[in-house]
Amino acid sequence: MRKFLMGFLIFIFALHVQAQTINTLTKEEKAAGWKLLFDGKSTSGWHNFNKQTIGSAWKVNEGILFLDPRDPGRGDILTEKEYENFELMLEWKVDTCGNSGIIINVVESSKYKAGWNTGPEMQIIDNACHPDAKIFKHRAGNLYDLIASPDESVQPAREWNKVVISSNHGHLQFWLNDVKQVETMMFTPEWEALIQGSKFVAHPDFGKAQKGRILLQDHDNLVWFRNIKIREL
């Protein structure tokens, strides 16, 4: 039943993306508890990691939030609110040979240098060009450095991709362009084993937080986002 509902959710999301104005919610979405994380007009609701403001490199144009890597006011950005059990939807596209990511359960503290020190990441990357995409578990839609997907469903660079991330009492699922990429249970012995076999073993608090902020990563490349919405479960 859960798989059916998730598949139906993604189908509806795809229809809505085509039929409605970007960065808006339908009456049905509002009734179901969805909220916009990006209003299509400003960077309101976002701030740089461990800061209270957002840098000038994150800009809005024609309803799209994007990172301008030429602007010195850069850095990862996070939601103002923390989330625990949720479904997140958004669309992204990345520049040729570009790299970025969506990180959840991020803990802000002066003891951490970056959001990826604590939160697991859904990889955003140009699979066809970026050298990191040659590495197993580092391709678009993967749970970065932890779990690879057997099914590649990413669009070419500079084309839009649809994402659904579901995190519900430790049950984590990633969907990319209607194809499930990852399904795992966090906060289990198996989860800890994944961490121990990854680069994150050097960060003792990685993957431990059961709630946190949602982060859009600055990885030195041009990346665009739109239709960012969330529903708490």
Identify the role of each PLM range.
Residues 1-21:
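Bacterial Sec-dependent N-terminal signal peptides
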Residues 20-233:
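Carbohydrate-interacting regions of secretory-pathway proteins
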